[in-house]
Amino acid sequence: MSHVRRFDHVGITVSDLNTVTAFFVGLGLEVEGTRTFVEGEFLDTVIGIPDSRTEIVMLRPPDGGTRLELSSFVRPDHQPGSPAAMANELGLRNVAFEVDDLQAAVDRLAADGYGLVGDIGQYEHIWRMAYVRGPEGIIVSLAERIG
């Protein structure tokens, strides 16, 4: 018997909620609901940080699949990670999206100042894929099904 019912969301803690939200909205995600501040006993208990307060934006893909939660801590101040972490460093390293036109997505992000981590690669005759370094060092994997 499985205890997991579905994959609900992936959470990313960020410093600049506006910039990161705009990046993902530019990729085609949609803001779900309104920005929300969360604080109090519930948050302190779940995350194990007393007197914490965070602002959250939930984003969803147009098809309504797994959501992306962006969280920016008001208190305590966020702890910076490595903004240049590479794909082989331990921990969550990328968030992946299937796109209709990989080159167009890469070109649009490049126009906004976001570059490739490596280059565009092809896996057999099935996928074209690239890693883009987004705001705050977030690695975003973009994949286009070609076969």
Regions found by a protein language model. Give the residues of each.
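N-terminal beta-strand motif that seeds the catalytic metal site of vicinal oxygen chelate
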Residues: M1-T21, L27-R35, G91-F97, I146-G147
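Vicinal oxygen chelate
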Residues: F7-S15, E55-V74, G81-R108, R128-R133, ...
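Core segments of cupin and vicinal oxygen chelate
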Residues: T13-G65, A104, A111, A130
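A cross-kingdom feature marking solvent-exposed beta-strand/loop segments within repeated
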Residues: G40-T45, H78-S82, D119, Y123
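Acetyl-CoA-dependent GNAT
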Residues: S72-P76, E144-G147
